[in-house]
Amino acid sequence: MKVREEIRLLRHGRDWRGRSTVPRTADPWVLEEEEREFPTAWARSRVAVMVRSGLQRRLLRPVTWSQTRPIVEGVEYLENLRAPAVFIANHSSHLDAPLIVSSLPRRFADRLAVGAAADYFFDARIRAAATVLFFNAFPVERHGSRRLRSLAVELLDDGWNLLLFPEGTRSEDGWMSAFKPGTAQLCVSKGVPVVPIALRGAYAAMPRGRNWPVPGRPRVSVRYGRPLYPAKGEGFRELRVRMMRAVARLAAEEEMGWYGALRADAEGSLALPGQAAAAGGAECRRIWESTRPLEPRPRRRVWT
């Protein structure tokens, strides 16, 4: 190990083996790190909204569409949807947000706030400013934060739509994991509709570790589903299951078609997020499955 690396580890309280140099008996007296403030209100001003709309239409969408071949389906389900709404999607790539923002009708995209990981996108000023400007992003703690949850509530109260990734982090192998309960709790408490979205091919196009899509304009699919409305007396646990089933069903349509995915869901043979990953075998096999390019889809009969 280089001397520079050793110094870095020691400076961060780790020895050359990566183990903590602080005695465990001292843990109760270690001061908790205070939550940092992330000013994002400026991105929701009238001027910022106009600038962001222009950047998304004239820069973000052309660049994203030039590097990938998106197939967008289900936008017609949004025709009668009233804002505010919460859009949810599986999360496997940094392409996810650009694909969704660029494919949404402008009446939703211009009033959209995107939840972004506070410890990744808001740890450096330049990256935070760019993320907030392009996506109207607001910080989301992976392990929950009461203050940041209240910000999501304030945004909904002000009429902003939200784009959230209920898994809490990007998938390491391209497979969906179980949804955290926070998004369902938010939707139940505010009584807002949830729009499920399934993305396929984004992991193969730009997996973890890449800062740019792979060459060759890989195919990706963005599929919107029917809005889900919290039923009267429905708890967040029940809504969470409905959300997972909806996204899993949309994702399965890529191979099964609409009717095949609907039938698999009705028969109980459609694996929910988390269950599918467990049944997918070793991690290397799941990664291989996720990095296979999407094949051109032949026309299917609805009933097949």
List the model feature ranges, each with a label.
Residues V72, F87, V114-G115, V222-Y224:
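Generic preference for hydrophobic
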Residues L60-H91:
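Helix-to-loop junction immediately C-terminal to a conserved catalytic motif
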Residues M1-E34, P39-T40, R44, V51, ...:
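Non-catalytic C-terminal accessory region of glycerolipid acyltransferases
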Residues P62-T68, P139-H143, D173-G174:
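Short, flexible loop segments at the rims of nucleotide/cofactor-binding pockets, characterized by
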Residues T68, D110, P218-V220:
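Residue-level signal for beta-strand positions within conserved beta-sheet cores that form or flank
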Residues I71-E76, I100-S102, R149-L151, R208-R210:
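A generic local structural motif
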Residues E79-H143:
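Catalytic core of membrane glycerolipid acyltransferases/transacylases, capturing the structured
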Residues R44-Q67, D123-F135, P207-R217, A276:
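Alpha-helical membrane-targeting segments
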